[in-house]
Amino acid sequence: MDAEPDGSALAEDLRAAVAAHLEAVGALDAEAVAAGFAADAVFSTDDDQAVGQREVYTLFRDAFADAATVDLELARMVVAGDTAACELTERIRWRSGATLELRLAAFYTVSGGLITRVRVYRFLPG
C-alpha cells in the first residue's frame, strides 16, 4: 500500500478507519462495519445509499448474505485533509461458487476516528 507521507493525527485516524473498514468487510461482519461509522454517516455507491449506522449495517448485512468471501485489497491511498482517496480491488466469491473482481475508487471522510462519508465508484469489467 502506498500512502502520502502525512504523519498528522488526522491522517493516522483516516488510515486506521479505512484499515478497520477493510478488515470488517473481509470478515463479512456487518456489525463491525457499522461500528466504524458515525451515527449520521453516509455510504453511497452508484446503486445504493445508506444514511446512519443502522442503514449501513442493513446494507452490508444484505450484501454479505450470499457472499462466501469478500476481499478488498488496497493498492493506494492518498490523504488530503479529512479525506482519503483509495484505489482498491474487490474480489467476491458467492456461496454459489460464482466470482467477481472489480476495480474501485473509494473516498473516505473521517471525523473523530469514525467514518462520516464514503463514496464508492466501481469500474465494471468488460
Question: Predicted segment positions?
Answer:
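Short, cysteine-centered beta-strand-loop-beta hairpins and adjacent loop/turn segments enriched
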Residues: I92-E101
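Short beta-strand edge/turn micro-motifs at domain boundaries
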Residues: R103-G126
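Short, low-complexity N-terminal intrinsically disordered segments enriched in polar/charged residues
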Residues: M1-G36
